[in-house]
């Protein structure tokens, strides 16, 4: 396995400082002239959140219809449903969505189903961009994270080899993505979007607020990969993805097809 293009520091203080320093401010003037014509695929990893989905889809489509800037973006929503009994795997679902979408999108917005935009900037990203700032968890250390709502060009997603396929259950797949960005020298853009979070269980915590078993397991996994030099991303991601595509169809909300949304059902072996 070849070395990373850019070294990933082993010291936690160093890596936190590097993560904080990598953020850049949005520069609308630097965006390509045709950025409003770039095709956007909103990718929503999903399972067992029917009520959230019924709220999220109309809310997002209404937002794009009303917003004076984002209304011009060619948009399609892809809900990627995990239809098996295995633990939820957000990263693998997003990878599967990217594989199914193919060349129909110029950039992606990786969107949790429980975050509703109040104000946000969904324009084409020059760098992988965290859209959710206000209303996001971990507000005291949010410069370290890129989860929740993330815009990334299809080219950058390929460069990173997508997400890891091996974070089962809650957490740390987005931390892994940030380390992939460091290894490839990609900066992160911080946009100041405001979102409303729908109520949902925090599966990384136990009832008394302690770390859950899945949270501990995934934390230990990324810590091990980090200690080993974090080169595993080169063989774990889009190039190692395996899934069964059960089928795709127009998304149904309240018995009606949603023209700008497709439901893709997949399962993992």
Regions found by a protein language model. Name each.
Residues 44-45, 54, 69-84:
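Short beta-strand/loop segment that forms part of the nucleotide-sugar
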Residues 35-40, 128:
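A short, charged/proline- and glycine-enriched loop
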Residues 85, 89-94, 98-100, 107-111, ...:
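Conserved catalytic core of nucleotide-sugar-dependent glycosyltransferases
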């Amino acid at each position: 396995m070849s070395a990373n293009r850019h070294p990933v520091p082993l010291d936690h203080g160093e890596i936190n400082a590097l993560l904080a320093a990598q953020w850049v401010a949005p520069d609308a003037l630097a965006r390509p002239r045709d950025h409003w014509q770039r095709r956007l695929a909103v990718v929503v990893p999903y399972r067992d959140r029917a009520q959230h989905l019924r709220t999220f889809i109309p809310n997002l489509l209404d937002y794009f219809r009303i917003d004076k800037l984002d209304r011009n973006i060619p948009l399609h929503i892809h809900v990627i449903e995990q239809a098996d009994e295995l633990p939820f795997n957000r990263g693998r679902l997003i990878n599967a969505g990217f594989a199914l979408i193919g060349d129909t999108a110029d950039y992606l917005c990786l969107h949790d189903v429980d975050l509703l935009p109040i104000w946000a900037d969904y324009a084409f990203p020059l760098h992988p961009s965290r859209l959710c700032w206000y209303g996001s968890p971990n507000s005291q250390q949010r410069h370290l994270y890129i989860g929740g709502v993330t815009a990334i060009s299809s080219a950058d997603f390929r460069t990173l080899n997508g997400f890891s396929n091996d974070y089962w259950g809650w957490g740390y797949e987005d931390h892994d993505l940030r380390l992939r960005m460091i290894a490839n020298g990609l900066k992160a853009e911080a946009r100041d979007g405001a979102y409303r979070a729908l109520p949902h269980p925090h599966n990384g915590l136990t009832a008394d607020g302690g770390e859950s078993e899945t949270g501990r397991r995934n934390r230990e996994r990324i810590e091990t990969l980090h200690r080993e030099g974090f080169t595993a991303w080169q063989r774990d991601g889009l190039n190692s993805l395996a899934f069964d595509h059960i089928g795709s169809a127009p998304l149904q909300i309240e018995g009606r097809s949603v023209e700008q949304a497709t439901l893709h059902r997949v399962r993992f072996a």
